[in-house]
Amino acid sequence: DKELGFYPFITQDGKYLVLYVAKGTDPRNNIYYRKIADENGDFIKLFNKMEASYNFVFNEETTFFFVTDNDAPNKRIIAVDIRKPEKKNWQEMLSEISDPIQRVEFINHHFLVEYSHNVHSQLKIFDSAGNFVKEIKLPT
């Protein structure tokens, strides 16, 4: 398909090559991966139905963390063990709220989440289990 765009990146631990696949300007995407050490290996499908957007945040061994709008129009953070990737095995790390998630970073074992609240950005920090830690006040 000529409209498919392929965006490869390597996980922060250097163990996996992840392939983000999108079609045109559609925000929904597919995710494939393979171990870096397996140079001739095939990509493994993780999300391949173009049913939602999945944006990789980080991984801990075989658990990949994503921001997704799957069943959450304002987005949520999920953990997916690539050894058991079925939806029933997903762990929700941060539930969807009324304010949409704009961006997520994982720094020093904490999620830094930017929300859009009444057309203004809010920054909140959550621990690695998804528990609220604090809000960072932004300049006005």
Q: In which residue ranges do the predicted regions lie?
A:
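Peripheral, non-catalytic segments that deliver or gate enzyme domains
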Residues: 1-140
